[in-house]
Amino acid sequence: MNTIDNLRSQIDSLDNEIASLLLKRLDIVSQIGKIKAKSGMAVFDPTREEKIIKRLTENTTPAGEEYIKTIYNTVFSSSRNAEKGKYGVVGGESLVSKSPDIHKAFGNENYFSFRVKPGDLCDFVKNSGLSGYNVTMPHKVAIMECLDEISPEAAEIGAVNTVVVKEDKKIGYNTDCLGFIEALKFHGISVAGKKVCVLGSGGSSKAVCFALKQEKAGEIVMVSRSGSVTYADTDAYADSQVLINCTPVGYGVGNGETPVCIDVFKNLEGVYDLIYHPDPTRLVFDARQKGINAHNGLYMLITQAAHAHKLFGMPYPDEGIFKKLYKDLSSKRIVLMGMPGSGKTELGRLISTAFNLSRVDTDEMIEAETGMPVPEIITKHGVEYFRRIEKEVIKRLAQNPPDIVTLGGGAILDMDNRYYIKAMGNVLWIDRDTKKLERKRRPLSVDIEKLAKDRYPIYQSLCDVKISNNGHISDAFEEIVRFMQSK
C-alpha cells in the first residue's frame, strides 16, 4: 500500500526529471531566439503553440487535457520571454535605478537591475547570459577592458554605457551622448559658442564633453579633484555660461550636498545635473533660486535609454512616450506650506484619509519627540531653539519623505529647509486671507500682517501651485486633488 510519503517521494523524483528537462528546453529556446532575432522572425508563433498542445493532449482525459494546457501555457509564456532575451542595467553595489521602469514602458518586460562589484565586472560580462544591458557608475570606463568590440563613438568618448551581445561577442556603445544632446534641447539650454564647465572626469563626463563638441560649444573646462583644473582653480571656470554636473555629489533624497557653490559663477545661463534623484538636487535648487534655467538628468536617462532600446534590436519608442515618462517618473509627493492657521494640517489629513496616503506634520512630529506642545517649547526655550529642532526634523524627513508633509508656517525661513522642502516633492502653498487665519495656539502669530508680508515672497518662490483656502475647505481639497491628478 502506498503511503503519502511514498507517493510524495515519487513526485519529487519526477519533479527532478521535469526540472532538468525544462532547463534543457530553455537552452534550446534561447538558441531559437537568437536565430529568430538574426533572421527577423517574430517571437510569438501561435500556430506552433497550438500544434504542440494538440499533440500532447490527443490521448488524454478532459481533466488531463486541461492540466496540460494550463502548464504549457505557462511554459510557452516563459519560452517567449527567453526567446526575447534578458536585459538590464549594471551598476555598483548601491545601484538604484529608474531604468527598469523606463525600458518596461518601452515594451521590454525582461529588463532588470544588477549590482556588480568592480572586481567581478569581467566575470559578469562573460557569464551573465544577458542579450544586452546598460552600464552606469562606476563601470562605464572599466567595462571597456571586458568587451570584445567597442563602437567608434564609444572608443572616441572613452566610455561605454550600452552593451549588446551579437553572436556571443560583447560589443560596447555609448548612447549618453545622444541622450544628453536631446535633453539640453528639451530643456532649452544652448551651448553653441558658450563656455561650458563640466564637473567630473568619469565616463559620463567623457560622453558629455564629446556631445558638447558636436554641439559646437566654445571653451570646455573639465573640473575634477585631481585633473589639470581642480575645484580650487575657480578663476579657470567662474566665467562659464553653462554648468554640467557629472559627479555623484548630491545623489539621494535629502542629500543636500553640492559639488560646487553656485555663487562662484557670475555669468551662468544654464545648469544641467546628470543626477535625477532627488529632483531638484541642491545644485539645481540653488541655481533656480538665482533665476537660472536648471534641470536634473531624468530626461537624459529616458532618451539615452530609447537609443539603447533600439540597439537591443527593438523599435525606437514613439517620442510621445518621452514626455509621459518624464511626467510619470517625477515625484508625486506633496508638501503643504502656508501661514499658521491657513488649514494645512486639516487639508493634509483629508488628503491622507481620502487616498490612503502616508502623512507627517512637522509640528506634530516635534511635539511627539519633545513631549511638549509647540507654544510651550517656544515659551520655555525660545524661537531659535524651536527652529533648530524644526530644521533637524525637516532634514530627517527629507531622507525618506512620506506621501504628504505639512509644514509649520515659518519652516520656509531657513535656506537649507527650502532645499529639503523642494526635494521632498511638489510644494503647495495654502493661501488664506490674514483676517481669516485661525490664531489659537500660535505664539508666533502676534503680528500676522508683518509675518505675511515677510513670508509671502518666499512662499511664492517655493510653490509649484497656490491653493486658495478662503472658501469652504472642500473647495481647497478639490483643487489639491485636481493638482495631484495632473501629475
What do the PLM-derived regions correspond to, one by one?
Residues D361-I412, D416-K422:
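ATP-dependent small-molecule kinase phosphotransfer cores
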Residues L274-K332, N469:
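Adenosine-phosphate binding glycine-rich loop
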Residues M1-K86:
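Domain-level signature for soluble enzymes in the chorismate/prephenate branch of the shikimate pathway
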Residues Y87-H187, P278, V284-D286, K290-N293, ...:
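Phosphate/diphosphate ligand-binding glycine-rich loop within oxidoreductases
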Residues F322-K327, I334, L350, A354, ...:
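NTP-dependent small-molecule kinase module
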Residues G91-E93, G172-C177, L184-K185, G193-K213, ...:
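Glycine-rich adenosine-cofactor-binding loop
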Residues A423-I458, L462-V465:
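A glycine- and Lys/Arg-enriched "phosphate-lid" helix/loop adjacent to the NTP-binding pocket
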